[in-house]
Amino acid sequence: MFKLKDATMIYDMDKEDKVYAMREINLTLPDKGLIGIIGPSGSGKSTLMYTMSTLKNLTSGEIYYNDILLGKLSDAKRQELRRKEFGFVFQRHYLVPYMSALENVMLAADGSRKSCEEKAKKLLLDIGLKQKEIGKKPGKLSGGQRQRVAIARAMMNDPKVLFADEPTASLDHDNAYLVMDRMKEYAKERLVIVITHDVSIIKNADVMVEIWDGDIAKITDRRDESFGGTK
């Protein structure tokens, strides 16, 4: 579970006109489900993801993950937390150019090569790649295909939290919906946090958090169980 208390991020602290990427955000997220963080460019939604995942530090306020105060962790402990608990899908794919799609996914693998290869193939097929594309290198794949490889790689080690920043940006609508359906299924036992400006692709989210100008404008909860979020 994540809990944010007065979480604030300010850029250009040394300037007279400071930029508030996040303004005293208070938010509680559960330990599983599909969460959509929605807002226009510059609204602060990506900054929210980066601070929750320990990739950036807050200016003030607190973020807890399973009762651990993230701001108190050393750099080494943060790296360990990201490696063991978190998975990431970024807007840039960061695939190894001389490795095949399958090999790129297996980079994140723990376990025997045979079992990991079978799992990696299944993930790639489930996310929409064709059998003939699995052995291709990134340079031979389209932007959308590379994006799906990155998503499969992020899922490879079954992270407890999957952070996805605009994961369908390179996909057409049909493939975007396929990927989001897969993420919805994946979120039954894990927490999946999707950052997007496109409300249509996150319509099946359990919870939608709308961010405007660094603040929470609205929270929509489609689940029966309790969920907390306050400004």
Residue spans for each PLM region:
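Helix-to-loop junction immediately C-terminal to a conserved catalytic motif
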Residues: S53
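Conserved catalytic motifs of ABC-family nucleotide-binding domains
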Residues: D158
